[in-house]
Design a protein with these regions (language model features):
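S-adenosylmethionine-dependent methyltransferases
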Residues: 1-227
């Protein structure tokens, strides 16, 4: 049993379960998740999708988020560094960053995703290190800059590339770093090319992530903004 109850609204609307995810050598994160996210896709109203093309990808625990969380443990930023997470979903990567000693602002476009993420931060006793807020990266309303911005599996749709890059231009400090993990999708390649053309230095680290008995290939892209 969890140490405190699942919020009534989440328990009413979703079939939920708990999963334990190994992040660091001695660090496991317990995560409240949707048991079968595919059910949510099957239930989408086509008119609702056509209006804003919103699919419930936030409900998945993605191997890319696991890979990014592990990367943050293996290559730690200075303790207390303030970072911004884009598209946090149920919170795995941002909560992993908080467990690694970072001060995290995690954002998503879906209020239910943020509700899961807040619960998961509290579940792992990290709600004091991570805050959550709504963000539409097409119209960001951020009032500060960050040394580090992260995102897992957010490069899959090319129409999102330009809004993400504009947000990074406005939000990432000079000399700052953007970490983006991706399951080696072809859609990531034009994003990388565009970032390099904008003056970012790029490197990539492939990782193997085993999750739910399946081996997954994840690429952690590292972009450094010019000073």
């Amino acid at each position: 049993m969890p140490p405190f109850a699942v919020p009534t609204e989440l328990a009413r609307r979703y079939d939920v379960c708990f999963k334990s995810i190994a992040i660091g050598k001695w660090v496991n994160l317990d995560m409240l998740a949707v048991r079968d996210p595919d059910v949510l896709i099957d239930e989408i109203d086509p008119e609702f999708y056509d209006e804003d093309e919103r699919l419930p990808y936030w409900a998945e625990i993605w191997p890319s988020a696991i890979g990014l969380g592990r990367h943050l443990f293996e290559y730690p930023a200075p303790a207390g560094s303030r970072i911004l997470e884009l598209g946090c979903g149920i919170g795995l990567a941002g909560i992993a960053a908080a467990a690694a000693g970072l001060a995290v602002t995690a954002c998503d476009y879906e209020e239910d995703a943020l509700a899961f993420a807040r619960y998961n931060a509290r579940l792992n006793a990290l709600d004091g290190r991570v805050s959550f807020r709504f963000l539409d990266w097409r119209n960001p309303d951020l009032d500060r800059k960050y040394a580090i911005v992260i995102g897992s599996d957010i490069l899959y749709e090319r129409p999102n590339h330009d809004p993400i890059q504009r947000l990074l231009h406005e939000t990432l400090e000079k000399g700052g770093m953007f970490l983006a993990s991706d399951p080696d999708r072809r859609a990531a390649a034009p994003f990388v090319e565009s970032m390099i053309a904008r003056g970012y230095r790029h490197s990539a680290q492939p990782r193997k992530v085993k999750f739910e008995s399946k081996d997954n290939r994840v690429i952690v892209h590292r972009f450094l903004k010019a000073d």
